[in-house]
Amino acid sequence: MSGRFVRASKYRHIFGQTCKKELCYDNIKLSNNAWDSNLLSVNPFYLSVNWNAGAGGALAVIPLNERGKLPDQVNLFRGHTAAVLDTDWNPFHDQVLASGGDDSKIMIWKVPEDYTVMEPYEDVHPIAELKGHSRKVGLVQYHPTAANVLASSSADNTIKLWDCEKGVAHVSLKMDVMCQSMSFNADGTRLVTTSRDKKVRVWDPRTDKPVSVGNGHAGAKNPRVVWLGSLDRFATTGFSKMSDRQIALWDPTNLSEPIGGFTTLDTGSGILMPFWDDGTKVIYLAGKGDGNIRYYEYENDVFHYLSEFKSVDPQRGIAFLPKRGVNVSENEVMRAYKSVNDSIIEPISFIVPRRSESFQSDIYPPAPSGKPSLTAEEWASGKDAQPDLLDMSTLYESKGTVEKAVSATVPSAGAQVQKHNEEKVETPKPEAQPVSKPKESAEEQKPSKEPEVKPTTPSASKVEEPSKKRDEDNHQKEETVTQPKREKTPVEKSFPKPASSPVTFSEDVKKEPSEEKKLEVSDEAPKAAPLAESKKVEEKEPFYVSKDKKDISAVNLADLNKRFEGFEKRYEEELAIRDWKIAQLEDKLAKLTEAIKEKCN
């Protein structure tokens, strides 16, 4: 009997599932910088995007639950004076983010509480700045077990290990050329790098000399590297001399050659970005410039091909969600966020189809919990520890509710940084003082105190125009006018501001209080934003007013969120039905296969 044997694997049927367009993130302005990075970074709550901000550098942070089309102008995280090249979320604090830029600076950011991109908000400034590199910082990556320890790679041919809380670099690893990719192992005791000299180096992060060095891919394009989590192995992707795309598996104790040699995959031209799932022992390879994502299962020092997610939409940036953020109830083992045409970010769920609706413990081993095992001082003193792990069944019992990781302290590195931030915040204060006078006078003229405006009909709204100076005797006239159409007059909308920021939207119009005042709306009139008469306001129309001048209120946003939740619920129900049908078809196919084999025998 001759037959074909299929390797048994519980991940053999993993498939990638996209979502509908209305559940994607639209109106994205992805950075067009030529530096080779992933451009995106994600944690269970936020998605960071290297933004095309024109002059200077900026990044955008999008809450994952705010899907749909973003406003034309969004709130940005500004502080870099050149393009942002790479970002990484703190694994122990879901609101803290690090970024490296073309200006040789490293910025630490904190996402404000109740942050949103759907409503106007002041640009966010860094809470700390790490200075030490002399050229652009192309890579930043947090330590997997020690809180507030950050690795950064620069074009000055150094890799620095920072204590973000103190703002000092404990170690500086010197290289002959620039590092192009780096990755920690699971406990952070080893760091592997690839570089322009086509060498692969394994480092002890506390020493300034590599533990071992070997020859990597021979091609001219940038190689990538990823450590295989808790395993004593790492993988690289790159190109051969003939520009064939390759993958290689390495033993960090012997870099003379890769295990099994360099494996050729195809002749594609895009760089392969590797992502490792330590729970399933599956590696995902996303090609930059093409729309496909391949995945292989690691077993006995061999990568076994599983399947491929195919798409006609090429990706230039991509990020994978940490394990504690996946949807356990839907048997989702990984989730990717890929850019589409540099204007849309599309979530892709990788699902293991199962018939049972109970928790699938065999595909969800414990995963990193988001709690540090060491402090930065303990790590610097030489201590090591395994990562703190989370029982994934708790996510199933909580119906996918993930708690924010806030174990790490928020860094406030260096007195220079604090002074720098204070100057940015305090300078607008003297300018804002004359603006407060019209507010006080407007409060004195509220209709509740001096009702001078009466509507002619219950449905019509009228407003009272404050008096103006028209001659030297300060002669005043009061007029009652009907509220003009919104097509002619822009609407100014007031939103709550963070208490720490003294800057207000009213600073855009700086005139004497006697020359310009705002109109008041009577109690009987429907709620609307105050009208402004200044020509400057007409020229700089607020970005939250749409072309047809429709009011966007919190109530409307709540309705939209409810509709999105309804769409998601319906999508999940249809997905479950589809998976059930697939499982039935697989059973029928298996039975038919067995019947055919019996007949052949």
From Swiss-Prot:
Protein keywords:
Actin-binding, Coiled coil, Phosphoprotein, Repeat, WD repeat
* Extent of Basic and acidic residues compositional bias: 419-429, 437-453, 462-495, 507-526
- GO molecular-function annotation terms? actin filament binding
Question: Biological process GO annotation list?
Answer: actin filament bundle assembly; actin filament organization; actin filament polymerization
Q: What does the entry list under GO cellular component?
A: actin cortical patch; cell tip; endocytic vesicle; mating projection actin fusion focus; mitotic actomyosin contractile ring
Q: Does the keyword Chloroplast apply?
A: no
Where are WD repeat segments found? 79-119, 132-172, 174-213, 220-260, 266-306
Q: Which residues form a coiled coil?
A: 556-600
- Region Disordered: start and end of each range? 361-386, 407-540
Modified sites of kind Phosphoserine: S500, S501, S553
Is Coiled coil there in the keyword field? Answer: yes
Q: Which InterPro entries match?
A: Coronin, DUF1899, G-protein_beta_WD-40_rep, WD40/YVTN_repeat-like_dom_sf, WD40_repeat_dom_sf, WD40_rpt
SUPFAM superfamilies for this protein: WD40 repeat-like
> Which family does the similarity line name?
Belongs to the WD repeat coronin family.
Per UniProt, subunit arrangement is: Binds to F-actin.
What this protein is called in its record is Coronin-like protein crn1
Q: Which organism is it from?
A: Schizosaccharomyces pombe (strain 972 / ATCC 24843) (Fission yeast)
State the organism's lineage: Eukaryota, Fungi, Dikarya, Ascomycota, Taphrinomycotina
Originating gene: crn1
